[in-house]
């Protein structure tokens, strides 16, 4: 991907959500390793928490990076059922998805919670993938721009320039997640350009042009090539298609 200040390396991440036991996860990654070893983009898999230690172990020495799907913002304490950024850091996890629409929708995560998680991730050497996007109602009411730019501004509140440069943002229109509906490449690119413009207004040209922004929402082998040809799309956050080695490797090897 071409940025004004140099190349932005494409990043394609698979979000497995609440799928795959440890054995199933190992089988999937063992199938993936030879299929994606020549990939020109950065490849990330995000398995469920219990699978992270094993997946971290078997991806060692490969070009596959490992991400978590979520984390809490406190380092430790009486927070039953939560996983801390320190725990992920000690596992040498590379990335962490923050603010996924399912977290916002089902677990009532707010932009303020997302902001705390972003800060905690950076404190523990994790690169966050910040998810933003609008619902079908918001899209139909013509407030996509307002909703998405607000999520970006509140999510990035008080983050430093050097942190935002490392960050990945994923634009995932909520109406296109798991529905089989996909934003057209032009629609996705338009909103992603808006996200970049919002970051530019907060941090300036250099940061905005260095920042990688993915599209997420029913990404498939049949849609990826066109999506990746767009000027502002730097990668994909892949859901269902990341659970099949053939599909995910076809997406990763889109060129």
Curated annotation (Swiss-Prot):
Pathway involvement of the protein, from the record: Carbohydrate biosynthesis; gluconeogenesis; Carbohydrate degradation; glycolysis; D-glyceraldehyde 3-phosphate from glycerone phosphate: step 1/1
Q: Which domain of life is it from?
A: Bacteria
Gene Ontology MF annotations: triose-phosphate isomerase activity
Q: Which GO terms describe its biological process?
A: gluconeogenesis; glyceraldehyde-3-phosphate biosynthetic process; glycerol catabolic process; glycolytic process
Family recorded in the similarity comment:
Belongs to the triosephosphate isomerase family.
Protein's job = Involved in the gluconeogenesis. Catalyzes stereospecifically the conversion of dihydroxyacetone phosphate (DHAP) to D-glyceraldehyde-3-phosphate (G3P).
| UniProt cross-references to SUPFAM superfamilies, sorted A to Z | Triosephosphate isomerase (TIM) (SSF51351)
What CDD domains does this protein map onto? Answer: TIM
Q: Which InterPro entries match?
A: Aldolase_TIM, TIM_sf, TrioseP_Isoase_bac/euk, Triosephosphate_isomerase, Triosephosphate_isomerase_AS
Assembly and binders: Homodimer.
Q: Where is the active site?
A: 100 (electrophile), 172 (proton acceptor)
Q: Which GO terms describe its cellular component?
A: cytosol
Q: What is its main location?
A: cytoplasm
Q: Per UniProt, what is one Pfam family of this protein?
A: TIM
Q: Which residues form a coiled coil?
A: none
Name-wise, this protein is Triosephosphate isomerase
Tell me the enzyme class: isomerase
The record lists the catalysed reaction(s) as: D-glyceraldehyde 3-phosphate = dihydroxyacetone phosphate
User: At which positions is substrate bound?
Assistant: 15-17, 178, 218, 239-240
Which Enzyme Commission number(s) are on file for it? Answer: 5.3.1.1
Query: What keywords sit in the KW lines?
Result: Cytoplasm, Gluconeogenesis, Glycolysis, Isomerase
Q: Where in the cell is it found?
A: Cytoplasm
């Amino acid at each position: 991907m071409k940025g004004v200040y140099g190349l932005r390396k494409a990043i394609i991440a698979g979000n497995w959500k609440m799928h795959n036991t440890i054995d199933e996860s190992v089988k999937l990654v063992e199938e993936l390793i030879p299929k994606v070893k020549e990939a020109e983009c950065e490849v990330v898999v995000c398995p469920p928490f219990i699978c992270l230690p094993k997946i971290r172990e078997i991806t060692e020495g490969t070009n596959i990076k490992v991400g978590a799907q979520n984390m809490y913002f406190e380092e430790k304490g009486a927070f039953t059922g939560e996983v801390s950024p320190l725990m992920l850091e000690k596992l040498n996890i590379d990335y962490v998805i923050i603010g996924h629409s399912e977290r916002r929708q089902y677990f009532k995560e707010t932009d303020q919670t997302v902001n705390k998680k972003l800060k905690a991730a950076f404190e523990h050497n994790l690169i966050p993938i910040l998810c933003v996007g609008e619902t079908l109602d918001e899209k139909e009411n013509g407030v996509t721009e307002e909703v998405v730019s607000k999520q970006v501004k509140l999510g990035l509140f008080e983050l430093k320039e050097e942190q935002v440069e490392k960050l990945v943002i994923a634009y995932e229109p909520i109406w296109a997640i798991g529905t089989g509906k996909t934003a057209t490449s032009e629609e996705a690119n338009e909103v992603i350009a808006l996200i970049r413009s919002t970051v530019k207004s907060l941090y300036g040209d250099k940061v905005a042009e260095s920042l990688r922004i993915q599209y997420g929402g029913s990404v498939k082998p049949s849609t990826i090539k066109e999506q990746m040809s767009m000027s502002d799309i730097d990668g994909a956050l892949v859901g269902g298609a990341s659970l099949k080695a053939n599909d995910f490797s076809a997406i990763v090897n889109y060129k």
